[in-house]
Amino acid sequence: MVNALEKIEDGKLAIASSDGQEKRQFLTMRIDSQAFGLPVIKVQDVLRPQNITKIPLSKPEILGLINLRGRIVTVIDVKKRLGLPLDTKPLDKKSKNRMVVVEHKGELYSLVIDEIGDVLDLPLSKFEKNPENLSPIWKDVSQGVFKLKSLLLLILDVENLLKI
């Protein structure tokens, strides 16, 4: 089970805590009503919604491009990508929506999510494969889960999410 996490960490070693358990840090977020975790090492930045330049004839889940400190970033609407109901409110700086910038294969992508959470230190011993009864929508973009006290935290598989 640890191997799946090592894969998404690009071979980085986990940190041993004072109780001897290996732990990794995950940025938590919400997409629709589901809680997700993203390895902190994958996160480049977290932004409030920015001005987006539309790309003519692009796929519906690609909202456009933003300029982040001189680098061009492709903006992905995660809800559209997963076929989930879309928000009726526009994406603006006052909304709770955030843009989580990740790097994948040398390119930057901004994932538009509903809400950002905390950074959690989670023991690798608690990581499990996806449950068999997990919705196919979530299973396709999740590498596995952490069962926390009040929720199931899916670990986002950025590579599968960005297969557009």
Regions found by a protein language model. Name each.
Residues 1-164:
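An acidic, low-aromatic, low-complexity terminal/linker signal
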